[in-house]
Amino acid sequence: IAYKPE
C-alpha cells in the first residue's frame, strides 16, 4: 500500500 498526502 502506498499513501501520498498532498
UniProtKB/Swiss-Prot annotation:
GO biological process terms, semicolon-separated: neuropeptide signaling pathway
Residues annotated with Glutamic acid 1-amide modification: E6
Keyword line: Amidation, Neuropeptide
Chain's role: Myotropic peptide. Stimulates the contractions of the oviduct.
Protein name as annotated: Oviductal motility-stimulating peptide
Source organism of the structure: Leptinotarsa decemlineata (Colorado potato beetle)
